[in-house]
Amino acid sequence: MNTITLTPGQLSLSQLYDVWRHPVQLRLDASAIDGINASVACVNDIVAEGRTAYGINTGFGLLAQTRIADEDLQNLQRSLVLSHAAGVGDPLDDAMVRLIMVLKINSLARGFSGIRLSVIEALIALVNAGVYPLIPAKGSVGASGDLAPLAHLSLTLLGEGKARWQGEWLPAQTALKKAGLEPVALAAKEGLALLNGTQASTAFALRGLFEAQELFASAVVCGALTTEAVLGSRRPFDARIHAARGQQGQIDVARLFRHLLTDTSAIAESHHHCHKVQDPYSLRCQPQVMGACLTQLRQTKEVLLAEANAVSDNPLVFADAGEVISGGNFHAEPVAMAADNLALAIAEIGALSERRIALMMDKHMSQLPPFLVKNGGVNSGFMIAQVTAAALASENKALAHPHSVDSLPTSANQEDHVSMAPAAGRRLWEMAANTRGIIAVEWLAACQGIDLREGLTSSPLLEQARQTLRERVAHYTQDRFFAPDIECATALLAQGALQRLVPDFM
C-alpha cells in the first residue's frame, strides 16, 4: 500500500491517480501544523472577543444575519452537518469517496479554514483505516460548494449515518468502533469548513480525466491498427505537415502515430507503391482531431490540478491579519467548464473511432470482405457491432451538452448562480464507458482486418496490441455470440492493455 506524505497544496496528478485506484496511507507533513493552529487561534480570538463573523457565530445562507449565542456554537456546527446531509442516489464507490476525502484533507490542511488539527487527523484516520462514509451521488449544484456530499462525509466523523468498512455497510458509530476510531465533536466554524468546498465536483471530474487519458491512448493505438488494416497511408503523420500548423497537440499526436507505425511493417511495404492519393478524413485527420482532444485533456488537467490543491472553503481565515473574509472560492465554475470541455473531447474520441469502424465495414473503402467476415450472407460479421458503436457515439453527443451554462438559484436566492459542476463531472463516467465500448469494437475490428491481410504483419508495437487481444479473443471465421468478445476487449482496455504501448503524452 502506497504512503503519501501530504504537503498541503502540492498533490500531484499521479498521487491523485494512486488515491483513486488504490487504498493509501496518508501522513500530514509537519510543515502544515503551524498554519492550521494559527487559523484555529484566530477563530478562537473572534469568539472570545465577541466579534461577529459569518459561519463562526452566525447562521448560514440567507440566515447569515442571525447571530448565534456562544453556548450554541457547537450545536450550530453539528446541526449544520445533519441538516445538509440531504443527498440522494446511489452511494459513491470507495475509490470516489477516498479521493473526495483526500482532497478535503488537502484543502483544510492549507491553514485557511480554522479547523483543528485533531479533526483533520480524524479524517486522515478514516482514509488510513479504510472507513468510507456513505455519500449519495446526487444533491450538489456546485455552489456553495458540494454541501450535501461533504455533509454525508462529515456525518461519519460525528458517528452518524452509515459507512463502509471492509466491504460492509455499517452504522457509522459501529464502523468507527471496529476500526478503533472515535467520533469527534465539532467546534466553531468546523462544520462549515468541512461542508464548504469543491472536493466532490473536483473528484468527479478527476475520475473523468483519468478515464479520458486511458481512452485517448487506446484510441490512438486502435486508430493506428485501423490505418494498417485498410492499407492507409502514413504520409499524413509526416512531422513537417504538423509543424507547419503549429498546434502542439496535433504535433504530439502525429509523433505518437509515428512511434506506433514504424517502418518495419510488411503491411506498409505491401502498398508502398499504390496509386491511392488520399485517405478518408477519419484516417488522414487523426492528428488534427485527436490533437485537439489532447489539448482539451491537458487544459483540464491544469484546471483540476489547481483545484485539487486549492482552498475552496468560505469564509477564509487569514491568521496573520486576524481577519475572516467571506468570498466565493466554493463556486465550482472552473471545474464545471473544465468538465464540459473534457466531455467534448471524450465524445470526439469515440465519434472518430466509430467512423473508422464504419470505414472497415465498407468493402469499397477498406478493400476487405464486407463486415470483415468471409462467406458474407450466411455470416453477418461485424455488422451489428458497428451499429452498437454508432448507438454509443450518438448517446455521447447528447451527454456532451454543457452543464456550466445551466443555473438554478437556491437558498431563497441568496445563492443565485451555481455551477452544476457535480453533474458536469459525473456524466463523464457514462461517456467514458460508452467511448470505451466503441474503442473495444474498433480494436476487435482492426485486428480482424489485419488478420484478413493473410501473411502480412504490422509494426512491432501494433503486433503486440493484436497479440494481446488474440490471447483472449479468437479470429472470426464464422458468426458467434458477439457480446462476450466486446466485454472482454472492454475489460482489457480498462486495465490499460493498450495505454501502456503509448509514451506519456500529458
From Swiss-Prot:
Organism placement in taxonomy: Bacteria, Pseudomonadati, Pseudomonadota, Gammaproteobacteria, Enterobacterales
Gene Ontology molecular function, alphabetical: histidine ammonia-lyase activity
Name of the protein: Histidine ammonia-lyase
Residues recorded as bearing 2,3-didehydroalanine (Ser) in the entry: S144
Catalytic activity: L-histidine = trans-urocanate + NH4(+)
Cross-link for 5-imidazolinone (Ala-Gly), residue positions: A143-G145
UniProt cross-references to PANTHER family, sorted A to Z: HISTIDINE AMMONIA-LYASE (PTHR10362)
GO cellular component, one term: cytoplasm
